[in-house]
Swiss-Prot record:
Pathway(s): Cofactor biosynthesis; adenosylcobalamin biosynthesis; cob(II)yrinate a,c-diamide from sirohydrochlorin (anaerobic route): step 8/10
Region described as Cobalt-precorrin-6B C(15)-methyltransferase (decarboxylating): spans on this chain: 206-398
Species per Swiss-Prot/TrEMBL record: Priestia megaterium (Bacillus megaterium)
Bridged cysteine pairs (disulfide): none
Catalytic reaction list: Co-precorrin-7 + S-adenosyl-L-methionine = Co-precorrin-8X + S-adenosyl-L-homocysteine + H(+); Co-precorrin-6B + S-adenosyl-L-methionine = Co-precorrin-7 + S-adenosyl-L-homocysteine + CO2
Annotated protein name in UniProt: Cobalamin biosynthesis bifunctional protein CbiET
Keyword ATP-binding found: no
Family the UniProt entry places it in: In the N-terminal section; belongs to the precorrin methyltransferase family. In the C-terminal section; belongs to the methyltransferase superfamily. Bacterial-type CbiT family.
Length: 398
């Protein structure tokens, strides 16, 4: 038995080398999407349409005694079924041009410096921080996450420095390619078969680690309801975030920690919970301003944490008297190698946290941050002290 995965374009047989077409007609079983199978009405063997998950297809191919060909769009290893099937079966892969290659050729742009991602069959959540700042972004779409939906999504984060190149039905009889503003794309209908390239035509705003406090929209700036820049920077450093970290921000308030974390964990997921509805709305305004698409929940932790994916990093800015129950959930669900960072203002909260972590088998390290900022006084300068903060870092004991 031999299994060949052959890439095919929207122009069907015209996209195939003669050798590939010969293999198809000599095979016993031809497998593919209905659209691909329709190109081979005269195939004499068995035709199997791919429907639903791929696990049943793998079992079918494992038991196949004859030669089988699997048809896939473009390059089977570029967000295609080839990646999955090659880990389960002994296959040979013969790619066609990927839709992204074709789209860049139509745009007449090089593509080795582009960022590639897909929202095909996937949630669009988190896309904003993943792509923010890249000069060129290639995106595989689907009917739900269409170019129209994508344009509206990007507009909601103010990402108007991008133009959208939409390539429809590439290689087919009804091929159409357009370079549009986001506003234009947001009001158009597109063929379901399309790919999108975002091209930056103006510089994107840049926010380095340690965003100034007054950059954030604050509901009560005079009340200090924000993790101050210096404390925020130290706390995020203690979390030791990776590019794909899953992060919880408990008691998010303005969302400052969630936002800074998202700039590091761009490929990860950011979750934030806040008990005060007005503060949560304030957080959402900041998320939009700083181009962070986080999961937000209104509730008093641990309420709402069951909606979050298991974390690699947890920041706790406030517990509202529920430290024990919050730490129960955080410690039990923390992924291997993860960290919890808790900010405490009082000695009593420090003692409670240290005791709670020890009882749960966690090792702790504490930094007392006593920050003072320079402040002008007439023609001189003095220092104005911020409240001392205990930064407690906890990880599972070895």
């Amino acid at each position: 038995m031999a299994i060949k995965i052959i890439g095919i374009g929207d122009d069907g047989k015209l996209s195939l080398l003669p050798m590939y077409e010969q293999w198809i007609y000599e095979s016993d079983v031809l497998i593919g999407g209905k659209r691909h199978l329709d190109f081979f009405q005269d195939f004499q063997g068995e035709k199997v349409a791919i429907e639903g998950g791929l696990s049943s297809l793998v079992e079918r191919l494992k038991n196949e005694e004859g030669n089988a060909v699997v048809l896939a769009s473009g390059d089977p290893l570029f967000y295609g079924i080839g990646s999955y099937l090659s880990t389960k079966l002994d296959v040979e892969i013969y790619p066609y041009l990927s839709s992204i290659q074709l789209a860049f050729s139509r745009l007449k742009e090089r593509w080795q410096d582009a960022y590639f991602t897909s929202v095909h069959g996937r949630s669009i959540k988190g896309l904003a921080q993943r792509i923010d700042g890249y000069k060129k972004v290639a995106i595989l779409t689907d009917e739900q996450n269409s170019p129209t939906a994508l344009a509206n999504y990007l507009l909601s984060f103010g990402m108007t420095e991008y133009k959208m190149f939409v390539a429809e039905n590439l290689g087919g009889e009804t091929e159409r390619c357009q370079l549009l503003s986001l506003e234009e794309a947001a009001n158009q209908f597109f063929s379901p078969l399309n790919v999108v390239i975002l091209k930056q035509v103006e510089e994107s705003p840049v926010w380095p680690l340690g965003i100034e406090d007054d950059e954030f929209i604050q509901r009560k700036p005079d009340k200090g309801l924000i993790t101050k820049k210096e404390i925020r920077t130290l706390s995020i450093s203690a979390l030791q975030l990776k590019r794909d970290s899953v992060v919880w921000d408990i008691g998010t308030c303005t969302g400052s920690v969630a936002i800074e974390a998202a700039k590091i964990a761009r490929e990860g997921q950011i979750f934030a919970v806040e008990k005060n509805e007005a503060d949560l709305e304030n957080c959402r305004e900041n998320l939009a301003k700083f181009r962070v698409d986080a999961h937000t929940v209104h509730g008093k932790a641990p309420e709402g944490l069951n909606e979050f994916a298991d974390p690699d990093a947890v920041f706790i800015g406030g517990t509202a008297g529920g430290m024990e129950t919050i730490l129960d959930v955080c410690c039990s669900r923390l992924n291997s190698g993860g960290r919890i960072v808790l900010n405490a203002v009082t000695i009593e909260n420090l003692a409670e946290a240290m005791k709670a972590f020890k009882e749960r088998g966690f090792e702790t390290a504490v930094t007392l941050a006593q920050i003072s900022r320079s402040k002008p006084i007439l023609h001189l300068t003095r220092f104005d002290a911020l409240n001392p903060i205990y930064i407690i870092t906890a990880k599972r004991g070895e």
